[in-house]
Amino acid sequence: MKKHIPNAITMMNLFSGCVAVAMAFSGNFGAVVVWVLMAAVFDFFDGFAARLLGVSSKMGVELDSLADVVSFGVAPATAVFILLRDFSAYPDFLLPLSTILPYTAFLLPVFSALRLAKFNLDDRQTSSFLGLPTPADALFWISYCYGVQYLSPLNEKICYSTLGFIVIFSLLMVSEIPMFSLKIKKIQFAGNEKQALLVVSMIAFVALWGIIGVAWGILFYIALSIFGNSFGKTKR
């Protein structure tokens, strides 16, 4: 019986992702944030439960990836699609493409699937990541969409930034750039400096700017990973 518990938690992740997709189509980005965050919680606890109970299976690994594609790929991409579909400030030269450009959002789940497949086959990513993790990508987009909808007036810069971020984040997910993990093996500051700095910064960003502060936190996470790696190499 206990071997089915982690898979049941994973299916709650998938269910949350499906509801997030439905909420995105209705334009309720606040609900999208809630359901994707719930999916992230379930995504954490399915692995935690598997380790705690001492159970694992190939089915569990595959099911986890399928759930993540929906919750952290399709769900945030649907929110981005709706944002671009209803966008009213396309620059003049992009107006002829305004009915096509929203579909670029679905590059995100495509590259999420590639990233997850790569992760499953890569034994180098046990204590850290190569490329941007899909949950981090999802957190960026759900907070970005939630925050942007309240900006007035919407302008061409938002159009450019959204399309640019789609390309950048898609490539980051399948890149070979080392990204540190938030998993803390020991409750001590030494060895967890980056994680502590990120958590404190994320809290500060959210306190200053609300939910869209999460997007700034993810950008800080990317910068901290990249420049932290560069500093480490220089130091050595």
Feature names for model-found ranges:
Residues M1, F25-A31, P91-I100, F119-S127, ...:
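Short juxtamembrane and helix-loop transition motifs at transmembrane-helix boundaries
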Residues M1-F44, G217, I222, G228:
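Topogenic membrane-insertion module of multi-pass membrane proteins
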Residues M1-L14, A50-V69, L114-A136, P178-E193, ...:
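Interhelical loop and helix-boundary elements at the membrane-water interface
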Residues N7-T10, L52-A117:
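Multi-pass membrane catalytic core of lipid/isoprenoid biosynthesis enzymes
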Residues I9-M12, V32-A39, T104-F111, D137, ...:
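Hydrophobic alpha-helical transmembrane segments of polytopic
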Residues C18-V21, M38, P76, V110-A113, ...:
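Alpha-helical transmembrane segments of polytopic integral membrane proteins
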Residues V19-V34, P76-Y103, Y144-S161, L208-I212:
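Helix-coil boundary and interhelical linker segments in multi-pass alpha-helical membrane proteins
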